[in-house]
A protein has these predicted regions:
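Short, well-ordered beta-strand core segments
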Residues: 35, 84, 162-165
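Conserved P-loop
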Residues: 6, 10-78
């Protein structure tokens, strides 16, 4: 598997309500650059519609691309010097799986997105959930999702300059196991 390194890429991992999105917003706000928000959520119910509307009200000056499937095209639309937040890989992988996209195609889409990010000058902050810490999912689809998302997270972490794991609003740096074994 091809490894793309990007010095401007930060990956934020954690569970639900762990502080990932808040930290991403804080990091982006401190860059003093234009911020582009790439949202992968789909407004399929009233709760998600309200959540999306609230996020848009909270960040009216940010350029938002709602892109549940092709994040590479959204990355390429963003100004090169802008700070991008991609929120989140968790829903993106789910969206692709619901379209019956194979794991190989998902991995290829990750590679294309990472390549697009490596062409940019601005910082990119990517959010994803770590879903492998809980109980084993009851359904085959749930287990397949957990496995694919875990491998997707690893692919993005390998490319990132910095990966952080968030728990209860606290961030822990993640280290490459190869560094530990040296």
């Amino acid at each position: 598997m091809e490894s793309i390194s990007n010095q401007g890429l930060t990956l934020l991992l954690g569970g639900a309500r762990s502080g990932k999105s808040s930290l991403a917003v804080d990091i982006a706000s401190r860059t003093q650059r234009e911020v582009v928000f790439i949202a992968t959520a789909q407004a399929l119910d009233a709760d998600m519609q309200e959540r999306i509307a609230r996020h848009q009200r909270e960040r009216p000056k940010w350029l938002t691309f709602e892109e549940p499937f092709d994040i590479t095209s959204a990355i390429k639309k963003a100004p090169s010097s802008a700070c991008i937040i991609i929120d989140c890989l968790t829903l993106w992988v789910s969206n692709l799986m619901m379209r019956e996209t194979s794991e190989q195609e998902i991995s290829s889409a990750c590679t294309k997105s990472l390549s697009a990010i490596s062409q940019r000058n601005g910082k990119t902050i990517v959010i994803s959930n770590e879903v492998g810490l809980g109980v084993v999912p009851e359904t085959a689809l749930g287990r397949e999702y957990r496995e694919i998302l875990g491998r997707v997270n690893q692919q993005w972490a390998r490319a990132a300059r910095q990966s952080l794991f968030l728990v209860a609003g606290k961030a822990f740096p993640l280290h490459d196991p190869k560094e530990i074994l040296q």
